[in-house]
């Protein structure tokens, strides 16, 4: 895809293509509408037990796409994603007369979350309450315009939901793990069976995604103390035995397990992005673009990571260390129930950081307060890449990944985001 260099504006360290905005409503109120929904979605995962961690990639990605599509036709210099993403051929067109775009966004976001969390009554109650509270933004419009705009948002959400149902994620198939030396087996303490083994076969958003997995180089298994594999496993053991308080805190900060306390890695990055959007007071359309681009990159990265995990079936550190180094050893955080390589947190976080760097720049500092509500102190970073680096290393400190897998995952996540950037455009001026 050819890239056209266009005029850009720099706002508080952010680099975005210039936009001729339509003065439809207060930018700050509209932005607050979006960030409050993003913050709510990040919290809802705590009350949606039983959903596999990787499955939240769908929730955040499809919701972000619906949000973007619910307002994109209110901006002349932005374009729809219809026709750019696999099997998303067409979306409803907005009415030609006056629109209340905030009403459409509000309805679309609410509809998406109701779909994903319909079986959790506390989540539905929170969604209903949020939707109702945001209706004050619509008071300056006629009742007819508001109703019409809400219906449009619901139509967008319904179309995205129908599209999401065909991505293959609901295909239930039995799975028998490969057996052999060096291959993954269920891990202590719960020895949970393999989770989402066919996720790598889900439909991607963009064409030729799996060609990016050619970057991966599987570590050669060996039990020889002089081998690279033994050395990288021994590093996990040694690091865990000499963790500094800061390293241990980092392991817990990026645990992100869907266990009722954390927001998952997807909610964590969405919370971080919400803070960035508020910090820089972005126009609504730019915030929606950032949300969509980040979550789309993470969605694609998850497919790549899970395809690699179940292709190579690399043994987890806890299994190797207990068998060959110290049979009493346990990691700092609980090992997720899927193969080790590549490291998912590194893959997903580098996808998110790369996507956001393409919009915010490589030197955008950020403060992450995602978990202050559970007693974890906020963290400040000089750049988004520093955030991703720490997220990856947290899995070494936690004892659940080898450094090699973290490095390989980081490269894969970066390529996933660049693949999205090369195949999808949000701007009418870019062809």
Positions of the model-derived regions?
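Acidic/polar surface patches and capping/hinge elements
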Residues: 21-431
